[in-house]
Amino acid sequence: MPVPASLQRPAVAVTGAGADYDLLAVRFRPLFARIAEGASRREQEHELPRAEIRELIDAGFGALRVPVADGGSGASLPQLFRLLTELAAADPNLPQALRAHFAFVEDRLVSTGPQRSRWRARFVDGEIVGSSWTEVGAVPLGDVGTKVTRHAGGTDTGFSITGTKYYSTGSIFADWIDTFAQRTDNGVKVIAVVNAHQPGVTHRDDWDGFGQRTTGSGTSTFEQAHVDPENVIDFDTRFKYQTAFYQAVLLAVLAGSITAAEREVAQEVRNRTRIFSHGNASSFAADPQILQVIGQVSAAAYAADATVERAARALQLAHEGAFLGDDDEDERRNDAAELETAKAQVILSSLATHAVSDVFDALAASGVGRSKNFDRHWRNARTAANHNPWVFKARIVGDHSVNGTPPPRVWSIGAAPVGNTPPPRL
């Protein structure tokens, strides 16, 4: 039974997204609706959303941030993250699958040189970027096992890359892979942007998490794969607010997961005909206690949306700071973006996981049936919340509040150092 128009949540354009947000969003909302229709089935059958991602990209979703003059939509960061939140409400796997793409778009927007226009054209043409950064196992903290080696014969012949990465989210859908590596000739840590469609590049859809099952994460292996010289980029030149940006995509996933749970369970309550003898009304849809549960979850979705929007505004200021020519102000804005997203993460990690669990209080035993798959909302939210543990972010926020300590903007994960050796930094 479809949701009556009078009961659908209005798509309110939040202040930070601008008055023209709905004009932008209307292009994608019919597609979001189709994506939502198949989300539960895809999750249950572990069907990767290849067609859905391709349809989004063909509709211009991947070029949202590209300036209008270059063929994109010229969306602001608040607009982008509002759209990602709406997409997450349809299927939270898709924003995470495209997280690396939008981060690389952002990096190219603040970059200089001829490569910037070349990449903008690729984004407009519908090319997708994935990522391969994390290495599992005994790789020491701060080390990089994936190596980039210059081809023999001069500086213009390019490089080869060899290594194995896990958590390669989105790479299975991608044309290019944003890969964290280290050069063998000078030891510099780099981003190697690897063409995904070549010999020596393989992907395995072996991510076995209980949530976010169809993000296309898993293992990427590079065996002497070619990298063009212009696509070996010093890591130190990456956009400064990258960690905050990556986190903000997960915030959108959390916010969208609450909305998705609210919508589905509200419809379940609306359609339910059985009641309890000790309830309060002749239908679940009229029972004030059941309505209270749905209302509280709806309020959580509202708070989550507002939190994401606030973090996105801080990111927009950080983006604009890159062009001010004022290094001190640029640093201040980047620190602010990191702190804003950290605070948002601390709040939403708890808010989302509790809300998508509490929503079951509006159901009965039938609500936990596997065919309904309502539990996927909790599994998805819990999985997104477990990325980048919030407990460390809370300490960082507190250290800044008490001691004025700047937040770290780049961090790594790996095997603990031996003895009293301090952890290295990127």
Predicted segments — roles?
Residues 1-99, 424-425:
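Amphipathic, small/basic residue-rich leader segments at the start of a protein or domain
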Residues 27-30, 257, 264, 296, ...:
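Charged, amphipathic alpha-helical oligomerization/scaffolding segments
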Residues 40-43, 303-347, 360-363:
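C-terminal helix-coil-helix/basic helical segment that borders enzyme active sites and/or dimer interfaces
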Residues 50-58, 63-164, 169:
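Glycine-rich flavin
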Residues 166-171, 246-249, 384-387:
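Glycine-rich phosphate/pyrophosphate-binding beta-alpha loops
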Residues 167-203:
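A short core secondary-structure module
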Residues 209-302:
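Glycine-rich beta->alpha junctions and the first turn(s) of the following alpha-helix
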Residues 361-426:
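Glycine-rich phosphate/cofactor-binding loops in nucleotide/flavin-utilizing enzymes
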